[in-house]
Amino acid sequence: MPTTFRAYQPDQGLLLPEDMREWLPEGHLAHYVGDLVECMDLGAFYARYEGDGRRKSPYEPRMMVKVLIYGYATGVFSSRRLARKLEEDVAFRVLAAGNFPSHRTICEFRRRHLGDFRRLFVEVAQVASEAGVAKFGRLSVDGTKVRANASRRKAMSYGRMREEEARLEDEVAALLERAQSVDAEEDARFGQEFRGDGLPDELRRRADRLAKIRAAKARLEARQRESDDARGRRPGEKRDPRGGRPYKRDCGEPEAKAQDNFTDPESRIMKTSQDGFQQCYNAQLAVEGESRLVVAAEVSAEASDQGRMVPLLRAVESAHGTRPGTVLADAGHCNEADLATLGELGVDGYVALGREGRGEVAADAGKHPAKAAMAAKLATEAGRAQYAQRKWRAEAPIGWIKEALGFRRFSVRGLTKARGEWDLVCLALNVKRMNGLQAA
C-alpha cells in the first residue's frame, strides 16, 4: 500500500491573507516586545519628525523601536544584519508588518534616537516595579569593559606624537620649500597667471596627518591639565607641596605613554578580562535583587570603577523616586568618599575592600574611618552572608549581555552615543528577562 504524505503545495496562493501574528507561537518574545512597545510613551521619538519638511514619509517609529529592541534582545546588533533579518526571519517580519527599511535607515534611526532609549529603559523598569517583579530596595553594582568601535592600532602615545609632529613639520617645510621653488620656476616659464593643480597630494597628506596629531596631542594635554587641576597642582609648581618631592613633568604635560585614539578619541585603553589591553569604555549597571533586572546604567571613559557607585544609586532615586536601602559592590567600587556618602544617604552598603580570596584587608580608622567601619562589618558572619549574594545578583546580567546576547563591542563612537547604546542593550535585556519571568 503506497504511503500517503501530507499535502505540500508551495506554489499554491492563499485566497485570504493570514494574520502574520499567528505565524509565531503564543508566548514568543516578539509578541511580548510588540505588546510592550504599544503601551510605551514614544512621544520623544515622534517629536523629532514634527515639521521637518520631509518629502518621503519616514517609517513608523513604533515599528523601528520594536525591531531594534527585539534585535538587541536576540543578539542582532548590526544594522546590516537587522535589515537581512527583516527579509528572512519570521519574528522580525511579524514585528515589521511588511516593512523593509534598509540598513542605512535602521542605522540612522538608531543614531538619531540613541538619547531617547534612556526614557524607555526607565519606563520598562517602572513597569516591572508596578507589576511587583522588581523592587528597588536592594541593589548590586558592577561594571565591565566593552570594546569601543575603534582599534587600539589607531592609538598613539604622547611621546610618539611629539616625535611624529617634529618629523612631519620638517617634511612639510621641505615640501613647501620645494613647491615654492617649482612655483617660481613655473612663473618664470609660463607667467604669474598660470594656475597649477594646487597643493601636491604628498604635501596635503602630510599636512592632514600633522593636523590630526596636533589635535590628538592637544586633547591629551587638556585632559592632563584637568587631572592636575583636580589634584590641586598649579602651573609653575616644581615640587609636591605635601611631600616636597619634585614633579617628573611640567603641569599639564602628559606622561610619554599616555595615549589618544584617532578613531574614537573619547575611548581609552583598558585591560579586559580575556583580551588583554583594548580600546574600551567602562559600562556600569545596578541590578535589582531577586529579578536581576537592570535598573540603572551608565558608561564611563575611565578604566577605574571608583566613583561610579553613588551616581548609579542617585540615578535610581531620580528616575523612580525611591532610594535603595542596601547596595552590594566589589572592591573596584571601594573608596573612602563613596563609603562615607553611603552612610550620609542612609544606605546599608556591603563593599569589598580587597579582591576576593586575598584575605581580609585592614584599614586605618584614623585616616579611613568609612573603610574601617566597612571592614568591621564584612568581618561578621552576617556581613559576609550579605556580600556573598553580590556575585550571582550583579554578575549574572553582565554574563547574559556578553555571552547570551553576544554584546561585546559598541556599534557607535563617542561617549554620549555609547551611553545611548548601553541603555538600549540593558532595555532589551530587561524586556527579554521580563518575558521569561512572565512565562515562568
Predicted regions and their residues:
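Anion-binding and metal-coordination hotspots
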Residues: 1, 7, 68, 75-88, ...
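Basic, short loop/linker segments at the boundary and entry of helix-turn-helix/winged-helix-like folds
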Residues: 24-69, 74
